[in-house]
Amino acid sequence: NLFCFTAHMSTENAWSAYGNDACRCINSNLYNSIDLRDFRRHSWLDPARKDPEKESYDYKSCRKEGKEYFNELPDYANIKFRPAQGAYEDFKVGGAADHPYMRVEEMYFIEAEAKAHENLGEGIRLLNEFMNGHRIVGGGYDCTNMSSSVESFTNELMLQKRIEFWGEGIVMFDMKRL
C-alpha cells in the first residue's frame, strides 16, 4: 500500500503515514493567487475554515469525523487527491484511485500556448474560454490585461497550469522547457 499514488498524496487516508501525516500543502502565495471564484481553490484547506467570523467553504470529507479532522490539518493542506470510493480505512479499495498521468486539461493549455506563439490574441481567447467555461464559477476571467506580450501570457498560462496540475508532476517538464 505504500507504493500507490494515493498513499503519498491523500491526506484523508488512514492507512499511510505518507499522505496523512506528511500532509502536502500548497504554497500560500500560489494559493492566494487563485481567483476566489475558481473552484480549484477548494482543493486545499483555506485558513479561514477555522475562524467562525469568516465565511469559508463547507468542505466534505470521506472520514466519519469530517470537519473535526480537517480542522486538525494544517492550513493549505491538499485534499485534491482522495481515497477511491471514500475508503479511507481500507487501502485495498481506497488505494485503487485514478492516477493523473495525462488529463484533457493539459491539451487545452498546450493549444493555448501554441496559438499564442502564432497569434497572441488567439492564445488569450483560448485561455479565457477554458477558464470561464471550466474553472471560474460564473465566468469573469480575462487575461487580456495581463498578456501584453507572449512572455507575459506564458507567465499567466504557467500560473494556471501550476494551479491545475499541482501535485501531478506535469509542470516540471514545462519548467525545464521554458
Q: For the regions a protein language model found, what residue spans apply to each?
A:
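Acidic/Ser/Thr-rich, low-complexity mid-to-C-terminal regulatory regions of eukaryotic proteins
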Residues: 14-23, 92
